[in-house]
């Protein structure tokens, strides 16, 4: 019995579409090719135009950009001949994606914008949502956060009205809207959006949105982080993207808490799940930068303790991470690809953390991070200023350090970025930046315990906090940005003022007086 070729073509085209959704690019390309071959070019048919457009997508995802571009152009010609304008518009989105791969992000955005407007005029929701997602994503990559938020919001509303909020593009538009406001510092709005990203998830779509909520949870130090992790972990095996988002942010969460071992474990697990066939891509940059920060912290602690062997081992491990970040930026599979603003900012941060791990906390490197993110990326610029202030303080550039520190602290307080605020206040106390904390009745000059400790200066109190924490003179010097000899003098003065015979006795007196040990 003869099979209807039009029906067979439609079946193969739909098969290709769904195989593409499952990331089976090779099988999808084969099915789409059959869909095209089943129908002749003449007479013009909408089904053949649709098959050509889908084949273009499968070729693109299979990595054959030249053939994909040719097929997309053929799809547009066939669509015009068959009076299928929605297919012509859909192929335009594919051409925009191909322009990005050819290193033409501005041209790509123009094509996405054109396709979005055409799809709206045609009232073709499926094509409209695809174009909206690509347009919003490209706007986010270019650093135009306001435009990205507006496009994602509009597209998301259209998806929601059609009951597609958890369908692929509806879901993607929700998280792009949220990410744009996370990046631009509109955290109240981002928080309202994240309120809809439930913690107790039961589906893969819900889990992906919940993973996105970790951006804000981690940056604000929310207690919801641990519960989200518990609910998300079962979904990681089936959703590599969701796992990438969640574990990378959980690494940042551990880093804020000073738990470098857990941070590195999350980074290692994330890297292990990445597809490295043909080399790393841009997503590795952020994860590698977080790992480099952890390696840098461990290397600095080792140097402060005089453990050069451990410090050298940390540098060796950090080399692997910076190599991964640089490879991701080069993107061997798409050598013409141009990194967006966020990607360039994280690459600059990775380079600065690499220098820090080697013992060179370079102010110029951190200044480059601040400038690369720029004022639009409110939070990332603020936390880059934190590192810049630290580097400037270590270099003895106190006025510059205080300026960067003050700018970062103002943003941290405005956003409610609690972990960053804590880190900045710790830096301010150690490097003596800004006004000292106010003191209440009966308190010492830094607001701490009084009476037996009343004779200590604010700097001696900081040294004593570190003594209580068991730090050596060298570690105290590193923590407070002073010379080891100066630290030794402070310790001697403290022992004399407290009439203590040893460091241990001084620490015991301080503990009895209620002085809390320094963190770390």
Language model region names:
Residues 354, 360, 378-380, 386-446, ...:
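N-terminal regulatory/sensing modules of transcriptional regulators
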Residues 19-31, 60-66, 244-246, 274-358, ...:
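Amphipathic helix-loop-helix modules that constitute alpha-helical solenoid scaffolds
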Residues 429, 440-501, 505-520:
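Helix-turn-helix DNA-binding segment
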Residues 27-34, 67-74, 107-111:
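Structural signature of tandem alpha-helical TPR/SEL1-like repeats
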Residues 1, 33-43, 73-83, 113-124, ...:
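Amphipathic alpha-helical segments of tetratricopeptide repeats
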Residues 6, 46, 86, 126, ...:
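Residue signature of alpha-solenoid helical repeat architecture, marking inter-repeat boundaries
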Residues 9-24, 47-64, 87-104, 127-144, ...:
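Tandem amphipathic alpha-helical repeat scaffolds
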Residues 28, 68, 108, 148, ...:
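Single-residue signature of alpha-solenoid repeat helices
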